[in-house]
């Protein structure tokens, strides 16, 4: 099973959803339904243990962390996130902590600078940012933009066409989170609509063949949890 993943020339990024200090299992974008992660009889809700177990199976260059509490304007998991970043300095972490204004990014970066932590990339989610003028978030920041798609109105890409700043794009299909399949037609349409951007995909990946299909339509990496959990349980 692991060998089939290794034959696919696409980067796999482990997705971790944090809630109250634990890794939770995503289901269809409804965050009230999230529960602490268990695989078989094993409790893998400790993010450090989860990453360690995943590294035993295959190499990770990047890990995506969504702080669900911060995204919902609750107490953040920042202290835990800082500990994770220090524990795995060889991994780049994509951090989605509900950043809404440039000052929220600057405060986060300054704290990490004081701790001498640099292995992170900021993720801006369109469900949270207050302005779609990406220039105000600064060219100097390492930024991925998460195009958070929950319904049809979230599929607009007009603001990206106008932007001179071209961050990497994460196509985040929230209703497909938890291994509920991929909307390939939507993915192809958006990628065709924005030819000058690099794309990453999240939401609904279930099988190795999904990775091949995403690679074929122009996706550079895939952010996954369900598929990785299957491998950890095998």
Feature map (PLM): residue ranges:
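Conserved anion-binding
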Residues: 15-38, 102-178
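Catalytic domains of carbohydrate-active enzymes, especially glycoside hydrolases
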Residues: 51-66, 163-169
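Short catalytic helix/loop segments, enriched in acidic residues and glycine
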Residues: 30-52
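A structural motif
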Residues: 58-60, 90, 117-119, 165-167, ...
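Short, Lys/Arg-enriched, disordered terminal segments
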Residues: 1-11, 110-114, 231-234
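Hydrophobic faces of well-ordered beta-strands that scaffold small-molecule active sites
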Residues: 11-18, 63-65, 93-97, 120-124, ...
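Catalytic cores of alpha/beta
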Residues: 93-116, 158-161, 187-195, 199-221
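Active-site-adjacent beta->alpha loops and helix N-cap segments on the catalytic face
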Residues: 71-86, 97-111, 124-142, 176-192, ...
